[in-house]
Amino acid sequence: MNAMRSTVCLLACLAATTAVQAADTYLCVAEMTTGFNYDANKKAWRSADFRSDKKFAISRSKTKAYAWEAKEVGDARPAATCEKDFNEAGNLFCSGVFDLRFNRRQLRFLYAYPIGYWSDGTGAREGENTPAMAIGRCREL
């Protein structure tokens, strides 16, 4: 009876460990978003809080050049790619149109969209892009 309990316990532990390691996709939803926007009337940049409706998926990359990729929900193309896999602390670092930091143990992320203010070039309207930062949580799919 004890041997049977030990076996069942061992199998349950192995299944739980495998499930944690096997997650190939995470769905992430922003909870708070802040940044800067341009007030055209005052011709000045201001700090701003934005709607937190950002959703994206982090999944194993389909190309060999990257370990992971992040796509905004509804977009087929990755907006950020992650060259390396998760590190020992469970952190993943991705960059592209936006920068992303994700911890798979905490299931929390930090998203940064750095385009605008400093990067709007010739032909771009002042304030066309609004730099923003979001934090939120992810869940395994």
Name every feature range the model reports, one short phrase each.
Residues 12-17, 65-72, 78-84, 119-128:
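Short, intrinsically disordered, charge-biased short linear motifs at domain edges
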